[in-house]
Amino acid sequence: MTTRYIFVTGGVVSSLGKGIAAASLAAILEARGLNVTIMKLDPYINVDPGTMSPTQHGEVFVTEDGAETDLDLGHYERFIRTKMNRRNNFTTGRIYEEVLRKERRGDYLGATIQVIPHITNAIKEKVIAGGEGHDVAIVEIGGTVGDIESLPFLESIRQLGVELGRDRTLFMHLTLVPFLGAAGEVKTKPTQHSVKELRSIGIAPDVLICRGDRAIPANERAKISLFCNVEERAVISLKDVDSIYKIPALLRSQGLDDLVVKRFGLECREADLSEWENVIYQEANPNGEVVIGMVGKYIELPDAYKSVNEALKHAGLKNRVSVSIKYIDSQTVEAKGDEVLQGLDGILVPGGFGERGVEGKILAAKYARENELPYFGICLGMQVALIEFARNVAGMTDAHSTEFNKATPFPVVGLITEWVDEEGNVEQRHEASDLGGTMRLGAQLCHLLEGSKAAQAYKGNTCVERHRHRYEVNNKYRERLEQAGLVFSGLSSDRKLVEMIELKDHPWFVAGQFHPEFTSTPRDGHPLFEGFVAAASAHQKRDLKK
């Protein structure tokens, strides 16, 4: 199969939405019957985002094969059916690490290792490998044109443009076209300078995606075409919209997919965007609203919980309600108690690391349990629910996780001491082990208890979900917790590890050690999130009857 490559760059400012634009184009091409994948090339020196602060970088998205990747890969999976893997995201740090490892082995036969050709060749090899087996591979370059960090990546795709030729490569550049209220018009000069910067390193854009808070007038598009040497039909206006799921249709209406298909000489059907039209209709026509309290520690940056936010919205679509997310700092719960949890239709405690705010999450789980409020715990959210139950129902006062209190008399949650690395090797872990790459990661089979809420949600006795954690339920206390009434509704493939818990005599109190948000999509939703939002809606109706 001959793969065509679309390289997506950004200019003027960061956060223009390259990932959304790339994913939206991929969605249209997929709707035309093409097999599409998307890659993200990140210019930072970290080997992966696994140890980066969520409040700086946003969430870490985990792929099925256990790669810790940029949150943009979450957008990719929500827009197209293709599942991402570790080949879809790599960083400057990863490239340098691999090149230096080869140098130490002597693979370069004593050559002087340089950015060109050794680093650029390594980048090109990864891009080609990531695109294999697909009709089209869209490659997003992180950062902004002009950044020092991005230069090796830009040089690499410039070389690929020459080596593969125009019939297999296309360069798409996102820029900002701001509107100045004082002048009463949009300004194209930033775009002109951004394209000039891109052309100075040897890349001539074939398509310009012009971002702004309004549509770009036809005369300004003609001006951009003239000064940037891009044909007018390839100057695409991408205005702000109230839903990112409207963007595929917006790009389709301007013929972007036709331009791509013609450029690559591909024969395929017209795009069928009916699934996206249905998503947009559901989003615009809810029959009610539920308020979900998300109790976490990274709430100052909602992108830290990006996939959870989106999964709740998807569940709202399936239940025909809009979901309003109330972000609650778990430390505020510690300071003010139950009062900050009033007026909610459900509580969700997402994943996280570290001791700060953990008692607030435990209090949130207790409030939900005692007040029959729907509760959904994810990863740490499951662990705090189990700790709360152990303390206040099972009689294990001061029960805790060894992550937060190594001297706890009841370590109901403990460190996983053995794991398999990305190369399949069994490694031993201890408290002093590296933080990066030393977690239980990726898709794992889970056996579900027949008759449980989990089994009802999944409509079966098994599920496969993605993990990212280094602490697990301590099996030593399983029997005592079960005797106190806790239901272990999900177990690992070997039935040795607890994957899900729930409460029997509660309207909906379900928690999982995995991260179901990573597999939720706007078209398909996710069974656990759908069940949670349905329970929240039912709770609201019960409250209204009282």
Curated annotation (Swiss-Prot):
Active site residues per record: 379, 515, 517
Glutamine amidotransferase type-1 domain span: 291-542
Catalysed reactions, semicolon-separated: UTP + L-glutamine + ATP + H2O = CTP + L-glutamate + ADP + phosphate + 2 H(+); L-glutamine + H2O = L-glutamate + NH4(+); UTP + NH4(+) + ATP = CTP + ADP + phosphate + 2 H(+)
Keyword Glycosyltransferase applies: no
Residues annotated to bind L-glutamine: 352, 380-383, 403, 470
EC number, as in UniProt: 6.3.4.2
InterPro entries xref list: Class_I_gatase-like, CTP_synthase, CTP_synthase_N, GATASE, GATase1_CTP_Synthase, P-loop_NTPase
Span list, region Amidoligase domain: 1-266
Positions annotated to bind UTP: 14, 187-192, 223
Cited PANTHER family: CTP SYNTHASE, CTP SYNTHASE-RELATED
NCBIfam families membership: PRK05380.1, PyrG
Additional information: CTPSs have evolved a hybrid strategy for distinguishing between UTP and CTP. The overlapping regions of the product feedback inhibitory and substrate sites recognize a common feature in both compounds, the triphosphate moiety. To differentiate isosteric substrate and product pyrimidine rings, an additional pocket far from the expected kinase/ligase catalytic site, specifically recognizes the cytosine and ribose portions of the product inhibitor.
The protein, known as: CTP synthase
Lineage: Bacteria, Pseudomonadati, Pseudomonadota, Gammaproteobacteria, Alteromonadales
This protein's encoding gene: pyrG
